[in-house]
Structures are given as structure tokens and as C-alpha cells.
């Protein structure tokens, strides 16, 4: 089918719902995810969640595991399979039937016996997997784990948009557990040489309106932040770049800016997330340019998100989950 990606990839997804399997493929595929296998196992009369988790743990083509589960057949066997899988690879799980209403729906959907939420959460946490609360959040976290790049800490450099957007972005990032660190002195000195008229106004997040709408300066500052060891992560609100399209040669400038974003993660070796949702401009020319850019970023393997809040929360959880996995691996190695 044309709506499915044709290339294989490194994400394995097991789902107790065929419709959820379809949505993860289409939503994830549009954001650059590619799959080793997607398995919809329904009422688990033959193969169940423990069998499939064990398979994905041992599958050389699968590097990240995602799961939608409504109920488990054998709690002890499921926990052992989940612990095995999470020790080897990142595992993201969405539980169906977390509430009384959900448990009733799960019973009629797949005859699953949905477990009590507190017991489930404790088991998932102890096994080392990452629990999410919606299908969109599952896709967000798999995008982070698969495409964002290495997360070595929580210090983030941000291209935050303009004015109030920058202020709101700083708040959202802080609330997500990220450290919006001030510009270090060596970076400020570099800005003094590059932007002598505005350097002292520039901070983190970078306020694009200070540097002028539709200009490259904000992106150049972001490149400097990505190259600076003071920052572990970079979060880019690419919506501010859409203003380049207002200029006479806007499509060319905008295309060049998007090309820089495509390569920023590879060049910096850091975790990069780009915010590029639906364009705020509604005329056909600018709408098409922005949507083409979004598709191009996804095709280039860039972790893209629809809004700053979603990206910041995903980045915060990604950093914490990666750190916990590293702690577990170190503890296991020293045992």
C-alpha cells in the first residue's frame, strides 16, 4: 500500500490491536520511522506478548521495541520477557485498559484480563521499560530513541522562535527537566565577532525576532550552540524559519536552511529535535514549501515534532530513560 513505508528499518512493534498497528506504521512512517516487523497478535490464543518480546529481544534487525498491550496471559513469564528485552534494547510500552472503563473495553475487544494499574506500572518500571499513556506519545518516544541522536546530558540549546515563544519555550523545557543553560563565555565571544550589533541581546533560548525575521543569523547561532560542549542537546523551533519564505528568493533560502538542519545532528554528534508542525501561513506556495520541508527532514532521519511542548517533553523523558538504561548496564556489568 502506498501509505505504508516500503523500506525496512530497526523498530519492532507488537500490538494487541490491528488498528493501533496501522496507526503506528502510518504516523511513525510519516516522521521517518521504519520497521523491522510489526505484529498484530489479537487475543493471543497462539503467540502472546511474552513470545513476541522474547523474539524482538533476540532479533538482530530490531534495535528499538514498542508495544501496545491490553492484557497478559502469564504475568511472571511476561515480566521475565520484558526484563530480558529491556536489558538489551529500549522498550516503550502503551497499556490498554488502565482505567475501569478501559478494562471493560479491553474485555470486549480481545477478551484480555487487564491488570491493576499500580501493579502494572511497578512491573514495567522494575523491568526497565518506558511506559507511555497514548499512542501519539509512543510514537514520539520511538522517534526520539530512533532518530534524535545520542543524549549525553540535559543541557539544551534552544532556537525558541520569537518574543513570547522564546519565553514559553524556556518554561516548557525547564518543566520537562531540561537545563536551559546560559550562553558560555566562549560562545558569547564568538557572537561578538559574528554579530557585533546584536550579540549582547542574544540568549538561550535564541529569540529570532532580535536577529530579524527570515534571516540566517538565528540558525547560525544555533549551529554555534550545537558545536559548543556546554550543550548536550539542541531543540529547534523551525517555524520561525518559515518567515524566509516572505522574501523574493524565499524558497531558495528556506531550502538552504532546511539542508543545514538535516545535517546538524550528524555534524554535532548530539541529540537534535526539530519542531515543524503545520505551517502558520495559509497561501499555497508557502504551505507547500513548509510541508515539503517537513517531509524532507523526516526522509533525512531528523526527529521532528509538531510543537515545542511535545518535543521538550519527549526530549526530557528520552534523556532520563537513556541515563537509567546506562546506569542499569553499568550495574549489571559490575555485578
Q: Predicted segment positions?
A:
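Catalytic-core regions of core metabolic enzymes
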Residues: 1-335
Amino acid at each position: 500500500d502506498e501509505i505504508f513505508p516500503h523500506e525496512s528499518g530497526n523498530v519492532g512493534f507488537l500490538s494487541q490491536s490491528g488498528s493501533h498497528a496501522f496507526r503506528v506504521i502510518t504516523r511513525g512512517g510519516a516522521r521517518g520511522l521504519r520497521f523491522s516487523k510489526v505484529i498484530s497478535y489479537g487475543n493471543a490464543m497462539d503467540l502472546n506478548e511474552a513470545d513476541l518480546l522474547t523474539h524482538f529481544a533476540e532479533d538482530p534487525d530490531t534495535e528499538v521495541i514498542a508495544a501496545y498491550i491490553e492484557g497478559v496471559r502469564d504475568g511472571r513469564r511476561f515480566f521475565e520477557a520484558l526484563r530480558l528485552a529491556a536489558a538489551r534494547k529500549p522498550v516503550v510500552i502503551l497499556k490498554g485498559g488502565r482505567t475501569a472503563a478501559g478494562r471493560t473495553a479491553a474485555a470486549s475487544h480481545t477478551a484480555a484480563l487487564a491488570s491493576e494499574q499500580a501493579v502494572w506500572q511497578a512491573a514495567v518500571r522494575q523491568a526497565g521499560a518506558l511506559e507511555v499513556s497514548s499512542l501519539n506519545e509512543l510514537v514520539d518516544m520511538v522517534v526520539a530513541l530512533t532518530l534524535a541522536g545520542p543524549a549525553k546530558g540535559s543541557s539544551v540549546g534552544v532556537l525558541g522562535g520569537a518574543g513570547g515563544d522564546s519565553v514559553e519555550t524556556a518554561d516548557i523545557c525547564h518543566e520537562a527537566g531540561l537545563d536551559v543553560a546560559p550562553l558560555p563565555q566562549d560562545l558569547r565571544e564568538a557572537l561578538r565577532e559574528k554579530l557585533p550589533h546584536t550579540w549582547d541581546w542574544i540568549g538561550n533560548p535564541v529569540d529570532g525576532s532580535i536577529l530579524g525575521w527570515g534571516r540566517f543569523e538565528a540558525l547560525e547561532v544555533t549551529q554555534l550552540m550545537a558545536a559548543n560542549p556546554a550543550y548536550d542537546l539542541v531543540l529547534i523551533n523551525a517555524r520561525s524559519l518559515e518567515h524566509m519564505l516572505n522574501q523574493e528568493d524565499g524558497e531558495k533560502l528556506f531550502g538552504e536552511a532546511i539542508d543545514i538542519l538535516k545535517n546538524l545532528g550528524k555534524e554535532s554528534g548530539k541529540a537534535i529535535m526539530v519542531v515543524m508542525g503545520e505551517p502558520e501561513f495559509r497561501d499555497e506556495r508557502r504551505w507547500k514549501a513548509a510541508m515539503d520541508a517537513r517531509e524532507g527532514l523526516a526522509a533525512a532521519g531528523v526527529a521532528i515534532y509538531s510543537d515545542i511542548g511535545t518535543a521538550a517533553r519527549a526530549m526530557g523523558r528520552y534523556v532520563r530513560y537513556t541515563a537509567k538504561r546506562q546506569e542499569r548496564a553499568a550495574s549489571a556489568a559490575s555485578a
